[in-house]
Amino acid sequence: MSRVHVAILGASGLVSQRMQQRLAMHPWFELVAVAGQSQGTNLADIEWHLDEPRPEVLDSSEIKILDINDRNLAEELKNRNVIAVFSALPSEPASRIEANLVSAGLHVFSNASAFRMHPEVSLVVADVNPEALHASSGQALHACATNCTLVPILHPLSVLSQHYTISKVVARSEQALSGAGWKLLHNQELKMQAIDQEIPGEAEKIVEEIERILDLSAEWDVQTKRVEERDGHIVHVELHVDNTPTFDMVASLLQSKKQTHALPSQPTCLMECIQSEPSREEHLWNGQSMNPLNPTVDLKAGMTTTVQLKSVENGVVSFIGLSHNTIRGAAGGVVLLAELAYLKKYFEQ
């Protein structure tokens, strides 16, 4: 079976390179084009920022970077038989470029925030609200993944909100440096300025995106901060519920969350519940199905959310969630979204 030709918007950022890593050997998708600022440069010559080596197939690739600002970009992509585009662009260029590609008939799956709250654009976490994936009449599909910090909150919350009325959500995040891009990882001055500081606009994004996905109306108390860790977002959460569940009742519900679709990036265990506090060193790559770690081949690695249920007392459910921010919370979530669209036969329409 021939693979679907796909392209990536963005070439050198961490999310773009996670996308490149995940698409290099993907069973359903074939990466044939990348658009960015370094037009004309061979993709293999772009500096690689991930800890894992660049996939060999990309090292030998003859892909040249297309001009991201070319008004004929859609035609350039169509000339390469591209059907789907993965966007790793910042919000401002995404707001200009993504809609043009959709209008030209290309399906766009975006990690950018620009269209997440647009009423005609799908905001989807593939294993939480797959039914929300839709295209406007006569249009190609335009779908967005969420803010990377949502995942360790959303997976437990999506399960519990089906059984309990949530009146208040209190969340405190500890977000890794990679969530702000590779420059923060390598610039000591920027790093010191960011650590332990509130992340502007982050809490507001978390609230509005969760409310849209779950149709949830609750009181919110959310604070976010950057911590001196390379990867992995940890969130401490308290849910105030209008019921009196027991610890065992909540634990049973969290453990009942199962795989929803048989997709290449979908881990067998969507949410691993553990008794100890989640650790980046031990649990960051949960979902991993082969050793040694090779996320180019093992698309499930880093896709499982890790949760410790701390307590259930007086109608307050306390838990800690951990997810890999550049994989599950970004590139992996976007690719999973495209896999869902493939399964739903959008690419055949």
Task: Show which residues each predicted segment covers.
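NAD(P)-dependent Rossmann-like dehydrogenase/reductase catalytic/cofactor-binding core
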Residues: 299-349
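N-terminal Rossmann-like NAD(P) cofactor-binding subdomain of oxidoreductases
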Residues: 2-198, 219, 327, 335-349
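C-terminal substrate-binding/catalytic lobe of Rossmann-fold NAD(P)-dependent oxidoreductases
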Residues: 5, 14, 18, 25-78, ...
